[in-house]
Regions:
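Gly/Pro-rich hinge or "lid" segments in bacterial periplasmic/extracellular proteins
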Residues: 76, 82-97, 189-259, 266-270, ...
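Short, well-ordered beta-strand elements
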Residues: 26, 52-61, 107, 117-120, ...
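A short beta-strand/turn structural motif
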Residues: 141-145, 158-161, 181-224, 250-257, ...
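Extracellular/periplasmic solute-recognition and catalytic clefts
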Residues: 146, 164-166, 226-238, 263-327, ...
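Aromatic- and charge-enriched surface segment that lines or borders ligand/interaction sites
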Residues: 45-50, 72-79, 108-152, 168, ...
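Append "and occasionally in soluble cytosolic enzymes with long acidic Gly/Pro-rich linkers
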Residues: 238, 331-459
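N-terminal lobe/hinge region of extracytoplasmic solute-binding protein
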Residues: 23-114, 144, 151, 218-220
Length: 483
């Protein structure tokens, strides 16, 4: 017995020595977390908000039904809202910061100084919907289940760089990474956790994970499934009166509705009309034409329905035309500049987008990470050693695309000059290089993308003499092409 105790002590000592890091309540990929360790609630949450009532939602996608309550397997269509309302993760992102996580099921996190691993301590108050405590064994079970062959392959892909999960003690779990990478801490923080008791059969024996279909999840989230109407595509969640996290800082003031209903619609236009008729409560609109022209009528004029833009600081989804830089012709920045000049954003915005779009100036537009003005002193310190290899424009003011108010003809003239500098000259009916080879552009057009917006751009490129080859592809082929 004495030998075992000494061995255990040495093992714990080795673990402590090999993991030199301090416990953190939050992790920020950029800078420091906004909220201190003793924060009471997120700024955007209202702890005094009244509780009760019913919120009725529709999905952001079109579907007429769902057929399972397990969102982690391949077959079938999961019920909407499960991941957001029923399941919880080790950590949760704040909505007013860029890439910052705070402990949810975990009350502290220890990221190794060399970014090779992370340790989570599970909040002792955390409980599943059946009243069981959330333990390290549940975390490891969830991880191993999701990377197993009974779960969707997308989870194996998502956690591909996580080497293993191991139990340190009853409420402490460690994840080792396959490579030193601090971003993997955020990957692990997004691990959904569920009870191993979810999916037991009538005799208490566990079902294969892909056989868990209609059994209500046993998880730790604020809501549980109250009613699932698989035939009509209606679903009701009920706020768990014994929800463990109601007073946790990352949850306080949130999840205030007693019930949340989901209604499914097989057609987007039908969904829009249902919203206008008051069938459900919130509609997030992504089509410029609808935003401009559809949401009108008595309910709007009398204030019963409200149309409102909400500013945000999230990284926006990228929407644009992407150059394949593996093609030699696009490796010349002058060619890319000429192609950019041919895109008449103002015309497209006015005639197709109802002047509702804004031209981005950064991959991180609307966030604190977006570049602006001249490089800072710290940025210059990083850039100076590479000055001879960088475009001089890098050291100047940030390019402001909307500021270029020249008409299309003037921009095309400049674009033609840039192409000539790059060795592409118009002759014999096409844009050609010194070998006489034409500039052929293959445009991969994915099904579902409105063609007028891209046809206008392709027509402008044709004025340079670019030969356009259009290829219509489906979503699967398009993803394969990108790879």
């Amino acid at each position: 017995m004495k030998t075992k105790v000494i061995f255990a002590f040495i093992s714990l000592l080795f673990l402590a020595l090999s993991f030199s890091a301090s416990a953190e309540h939050g992790l920020a990929l950029y800078g420091e977390p906004k909220y201190p360790a003793n924060f009471l609630h997120f700024d955007y949450a209202n702890p005094q908000a009244p509780k009760g009532g019913t919120l009725t939602l529709a999905t952001s996608y079109t579907a007429s039904s769902f057929d399972k309550l397990n969102p982690f397997t391949v077959r079938g269509r999961p019920a909407p809202g499960l991941l957001e309302l029923v399941f919880e993760t080790l950590a949760v992102y704040s909505l007013d910061e860029t890439m910052t996580q705070y402990g949810l099921l975990a009350d502290d996190m220890q990221l190794a100084e060399d970014y090779s691993s992370i340790v989570f301590h599970i909040n002792p108050r955390a409980r599943f919907s059946n009243g069981d405590p959330v333990l390290a064994s549940d975390v490891v079970y969830s991880f191993e289940t999701l990377i197993g062959d009974k779960a969707s392959p997308r989870f194996r892909s998502f956690f591909a760089k996580i080497a293993k999960a191991s139990i340190v003690d009853n409420r402490t779990v460690r994840f080792d990474f396959k490579e030193a990478n601090r971003e993997l801490a955020f990957v692990v923080g997004a691990l959904p956790v569920f009870s191993r008791k979810w999916g037991l059969d009538d005799k208490g024996a566990p079902l294969a994970f892909d056989q868990i279909v209609h059994q209500p999840p046993i998880a730790s989230g604020p809501y549980t499934v109250e009613e699932a109407d698989y035939g009509r595509g209606n679903l009701t969640y009920r706020l768990n009166p014994d929800y463990w996290g109601v007073d946790e800082p990352v949850r306080k003031g949130t999840h205030n509705f007693e019930r949340i209903n989901y209604k499914l619609f097989r057609d987007y236009d039908l969904q829009v009309e249902a919203f206008k008729a008051g069938v459900f409560d919130i509609m997030v609109e992504g089509k410029a034409r609808n935003w401009c022209c559809v949401y009108k009528g008595v309910r709007f004029s009398e204030g019963e329905a409200i149309k409102k833009l909400f500013p945000h600081k999230n990284i926006p989804a990228m929407n644009g035309y992407i150059f394949n830089l593996r093609k030699e012709r696009f490796q010349d920045v002058r060619v890319r500049r000429a192609f950019t000049l041919a895109f008449d954003f103002d015309w497209v915005n006015k005639n197709i987008f109802y002047e509702e779009y804004r031209q981005p100036y950064s991959y991180f537009s609307t966030t604190e990470l977006a570049a602006s003005g001249l490089p800072s002193e710290d940025e210059l310190g990083l850039l100076e050693p590479w000055r001879d290899q960088l475009d001089p424009a890098v050291f100047g003011s940030m390019v402001d695309l909307p500021a270029d108010k020249r008409n299309l003809r003037e921009r095309l003239i400049e674009g033609q000059r840039l192409l000539e500098e790059a060795g592409w000259v118009y002759r014999d009916g096409a844009l050609r290089n010194a070998k006489g080879e034409p500039f052929v552009l293959e445009a991969s057009l994915t099904e579902g993308i409105p063609l007028p917006r891209i046809e206008t751009y392709l027509r402008n490129l044709g004025q340079y003499g670019v030969i356009i080859k259009r290829r219509l592809t489906d979503q699967v082929s398009s993803r394969r092409d990108m790879q």
